[in-house]
């Protein structure tokens, strides 16, 4: 085992609901310790600005461009991440000097893998200056430069977790990690540590957009709205018949690849119920492209907290002879897993270890990635 490094991971996902922070100790291969984690919610006004940023980003041709509000938005987003790091350190009585590196995802505002273009807002140099900690950021670009889709990146961390769980006899291969965030993705861990990963379809994004447009709330907490509705089979099938699910070549998704239904298509409750079903069914339908039928689906991300999604997923998986377990049943943290992954990837980046593989993003060969922003020297801060 190499030198153990203390890392903080920061994740602001496609749901745009806030910043997840997690601490991890690792040598870039073995997970030595999963530390504390926390979430810092964005206020409604800032969430609205982020959504405006998505519109501004549509005109980007080169990834360095920041048209419209994006330059100011990137600056504020970075400062909010710095505040989250400082608050997390204070809350957990951790000295910044004891943290070796921060893994900074930033906020994705554009992802066009067919054009080798991905844009995450986030100023790594500013974050390093504000926190006094080295920062690894921009971890998707090198994958795209080598022919990859730029996503998903979390499979390297899933593989490390699977190794830990299988060593303890808690899972048996083949197993699949399911992350239900704004977009859902699958990581298949097969026999002999084979890794295959890809986006599986819409996660929470469509439900969030639907209830925000029709009820003025950011998400369907606890699936309460969906639980009052019925699945509209024709509407569900209009999503599940999308060419994405039948294409032999897997690709990464942007939140704009699937749009919510029109306002007249369903009642609030039926729309939420149908979209919850689509989320679950998309996972099982996409799993048909895996090398083998999974024994276990390990579910993390915000979608695992929606009982309606989980109920449908259980039912559909059982019909395939598989079981579904929430991350917590295996002593994992389903809320902080992506933030933990970004801490893990930051350490791998510093060590020059691969972040992505041909089986995860379609990259031509295993490649590392990320840019390193150094913390200010003592002379600069004196």
Curated annotation (Swiss-Prot):
ATP binds at residues 13-20. Its EC number is 2.7.1.170. It comes from the Bacteria. It catalyses: 1,6-anhydro-N-acetyl-beta-muramate + ATP + H2O = N-acetyl-D-muramate 6-phosphate + ADP + H(+). HAMAP family: AnhMurNAc_kinase. Pathway: Amino-sugar metabolism; 1,6-anhydro-N-acetylmuramate degradation; Cell wall biogenesis; peptidoglycan recycling. GO terms for molecular function: ATP binding; kinase activity; phosphotransferase activity, alcohol group as acceptor. Catalyzes the specific phosphorylation of 1,6-anhydro-N-acetylmuramic acid (anhMurNAc) with the simultaneous cleavage of the 1,6-anhydro ring, generating MurNAc-6-P. Is required for the utilization of anhMurNAc either imported from the medium or derived from its own cell wall murein, and thus plays a role in cell wall recycling. It is an enzyme of class 2 (transferase). This is Anhydro-N-acetylmuramic acid kinase. Belongs to the anhydro-N-acetylmuramic acid kinase family. The lineage of its organism: Bacteria, Pseudomonadati, Pseudomonadota, Alphaproteobacteria, Hyphomicrobiales. GO terms for biological process: 1,6-anhydro-N-acetyl-beta-muramic acid catabolic process; amino sugar metabolic process; peptidoglycan turnover. It comes from Sinorhizobium medicae (strain WSM419). Keywords: ATP-binding, Carbohydrate metabolism, Kinase, Nucleotide-binding, Transferase. The keyword ATP-binding applies.
């Amino acid at each position: 085992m190499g030198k153990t490094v203390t890392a903080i991971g920061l994740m602001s996902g496609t749901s745009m609901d806030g910043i997840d922070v997690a601490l991890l100790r690792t040598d870039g291969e073995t997970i030595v310790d999963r530390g504390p984690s926390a979430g810092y919610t964005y206020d409604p006004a800032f969430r609205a600005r982020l959504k405006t940023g998505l519109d501004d980003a549509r005109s980007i041709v080169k990834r360095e461009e920041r048209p419209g509000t994006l330059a100011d938005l990137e600056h504020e987003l970075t400062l909010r991440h710095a505040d989250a790091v400082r608050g997390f350190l204070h809350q957990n009585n951790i000295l910044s000097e004891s943290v070796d590196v921060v893994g900074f995802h930033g906020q994705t505002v554009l992802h066009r893998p067919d054009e080798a273009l991905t844009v995450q807002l986030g100023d790594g140099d500013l974050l390093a200056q504000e926190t006094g900690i080295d920062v690894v950021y921009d971890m998707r670009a090198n994958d795209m430069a080598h022919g990859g889709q730029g996503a998903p990146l979390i499979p390297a961390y899933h593989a490390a977790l699977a190794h830990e769980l299988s060593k303890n006899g808690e899972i048996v291969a083949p197993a699949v990690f399911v992350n239900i965030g704004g977009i859902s993705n699958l990581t298949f861990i097969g026999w002999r540590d084979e890794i295959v990963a890809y986006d599986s379809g819409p996660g929470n994004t469509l439900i969030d957009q639907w209830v925000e447009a029709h009820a003025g709330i950011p998400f369907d907490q606890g699936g309460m709205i969906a639980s009052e509705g019925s699945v509209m089979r024709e509407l569900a099938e209009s999503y599940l018949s999308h060419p994405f699910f039948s294409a032999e070549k897997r690709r990464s998704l942007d939140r704009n690849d699937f749009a919510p239904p029109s306002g007249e298509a369903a009642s609030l409750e039926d729309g939420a119920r149908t979209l919850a079903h689509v989320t679950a069914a998309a996972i099982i339908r996409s799993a048909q492209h895996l090398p083998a039928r999974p024994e276990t689906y390990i579910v993390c991300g915000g979608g695992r907290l929606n009982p309606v999604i989980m109920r449908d997923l259980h039912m559909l998986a059982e019909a395939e002879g598989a079981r579904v377990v929430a991350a917590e049943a295996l002593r994992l943290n389903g809320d902080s897993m992506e933030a933990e992954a970004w801490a893990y990837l930051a350490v791998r980046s510093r060590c020059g270890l691969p972040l992505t593989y041909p089986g995860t993003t379609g990259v031509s060969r295993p490649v590392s990635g990320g840019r390193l922003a150094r913390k200010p020297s003592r002379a600069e801060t004196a």
